[in-house]
Structure formats: C-alpha cells, structure tokens
Amino acid sequence: ELTRLVQAVLSVCRAPLVLDADGINAAAPHIDVLRGCACPVVLTPHDGEFLRLGGDPKAADRTQEAMRLADRTHAVLLLKGSRTVITDGLNVYVNHTGNPGLAAGGSGDVLAGMLVSLLGQHIMPREAAAAAAWLHGSAADLAAQELGEYGMVPEDLLLRIPRLLL
C-alpha cells in the first residue's frame, strides 16, 4: 500500500524528498511522521491536498496558514495557487508568476521535476522550491503569451524552460 511505502521512505531517506499528489495523500493521515524525518521534505499541495494535510485553504491569511503547517511538519511547503506560497515556517516567498493555464493536468508534475532537479544540485529546499515555482510560473507566462493560457499542456512549459535559464 502506498501509505506504508511513503512511511518507509520517510523513515530511511537521507536525501531531500519531494511529496506531491498521491505522496501527499498517502502521508496526510500520518503527517506528524514528517517531524521526525531525517531528510529535508518539500510538500507541494494544491488546496485540496492542503486541506487533507490539516491546512485551511480558505483561511483569511493563506500565508500564515501555510507557515503554520510548515512549522507543524518541519517541511518546506510550496502551496500552489494563483499566488504560490513557499515557506519553511519562518521565511516566506510568494510567487507572482503563472496563470490559469497551470491548472492543466500534469503541470504539477513539471513543477515537481524542476524541484527535484534543483534539490539534486544541492540547492537548499526553501530556495529550490522558490526557484522552481518562479521557473514554472514564468514558463507558463511565456506559453500564454505565445499560445494563450487555455489549452496549455505540460510540454508547453517544458519547451520554454531553457529560455528562462539562459
């Protein structure tokens, strides 16, 4: 079962770990396990996953709610939305790039892939999450300028990332 697998990985992992989608859903019932994890963890929930983790996506202050959950879990939280919030519980970045085209299925997988790539280059988790969010949103903004934001697919993001890195 996925929940047991995620718990097992959390108990032995030493490298930075990104939990997204089903990984978040599997960890949610045992969220306090993250506090004792030996590796840095980055959670990348959308509002529904944030709710399952114990956050309130409709809170009056979304940033404070994200900080509260990051502090509780000892994880870096990248709360996806129209203004993505990245926090480790103490420091906060708010990403202002991106557009509704990012709601397309698979775009979160592109974000997770960029984040894992940055972590693999030994960039600190909070900074890697902030950089990945900016790159992701900026790639979507380029795609929207060139193609429109409706009908955007993950490949549209992937094709624009190299221009942002030059």
Predicted regions and their residues:
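Charged C-terminal helix
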Residues: S138-L166
